[in-house]
From Swiss-Prot:
Spans traversing the lipid bilayer: 84-104, 136-156, 186-205
Species annotation: Homo sapiens
The protein, known as: Voltage-gated monoatomic cation channel TMEM109
Stretches in topological domain Lumenal: 34-83, 157-185
InterPro entries assigned to the protein according to its UniProt record, in alphabetical order: TMEM109
GO CC annotations, alphabetized: extracellular exosome; monoatomic ion channel complex; nuclear outer membrane; sarcoplasmic reticulum membrane
Keyword Transmembrane: yes
Top-level taxonomy: Eukaryota, Metazoa, Chordata, Craniata, Vertebrata
Length: 243
């Protein structure tokens, strides 16, 4: 029971991490392809861009998903998401063009080169789509790095706890063997215990806070469930009294 309760959160985290890695690779692959088409100079748009590592990984992930889900289903999902993303990008592009015109008029009224300064706000739908894809990929990578960092810190916390216990036991044994005077032994043992308690407090404060927050959330769910049961019992009693 304990092993299953410990391994199930780790399994969920690993599954989420793998899923988010696949999503991040697909988004980065789409963003790379889109950015080459929209931000490349006019003379270089017709040339075939060199295939980099991210593009190769994205293609391999796409091939794996085609094998798992099916090419038709994957093509349907890709086309639907592309249409939705293109509609959103077109709306944002129209808004940026309108904002560019307003900013240009205001800057021209102030005596500045408004048309030149507001030129950067005129983004095509493809460019907006590229920004959205890269932004989504960056958010996914940030979430993935946060998850991996949390797992690494949790693992390091357990390793440090074991190392701290081993050092304390070694110091205790060395203290008992090397110090014959009982008073000096008691003082050194007290100092060792204080040091161990301080290290436990410093290393376990974050973990204890997270555990306390999880316990509070569990208690809140239990309270809500009890309230729901009380309301249901009260409604049942009222219906019985009415009958």
């Amino acid at each position: 029971m304990a092993a299953s309760s410990i391994s199930s959160p780790w399994g969920k985290h690993v599954f989420k991490a793998i899923l988010m890695v696949l999503v991040a690779l697909i988004l980065l692959h789409s963003a790379l392809a889109q950015s080459r088409r929209d931000f490349a100079p006019p003379g270089q748009q017709k040339r075939e861009a060199p295939v980099d590592v991210l593009t190769q990984i994205g293609r391999s992930v796409r091939g794996t998903l085609d094998a798992w889900i099916g090419p038709e289903t994957m093509h349907l999902v890709s086309e639907s998401s592309s249409q939705v993303l293109w509609a959103i990008s077109s709306a944002i592009s129209v808004a940026f063009f309108a904002l560019s015109g307003i900013a240009a008029q205001l800057l021209n009224a102030l005596g500045l080169a408004g048309d030149y300064l507001a030129q950067g706000l005129k983004l095509s739908p493809g460019q907006v789509q590229t920004f959205l894809l890269w932004g989504a990929g960056a958010l996914v990578v940030y979430w993935l790095l946060s998850l991996l960092l949390g797992l690494v810190l949790a693992l390091l916390g357990r390793i440090l706890w074991g190392l701290k216990l081993v050092i304390f036991l070694a110091g205790f044994v060395a203290l008992m063997r090397s110090v014959p005077d009982p008073s000096t032994r008691a003082l050194l043992l007290l100092a060792l215990l204080i040091l161990y308690a301080l290290l436990s407090r410093l290393t376990g404060s974050r973990a204890s806070g997270a555990q306390l927050e999880a316990k509070v959330r569990g208690l809140e769910r239990q309270v809500e469930e009890l309230r729901w049961r009380q309301r249901r019992a009260a409604k049942g009693a009222r219906s019985v009294e009415e009958e």
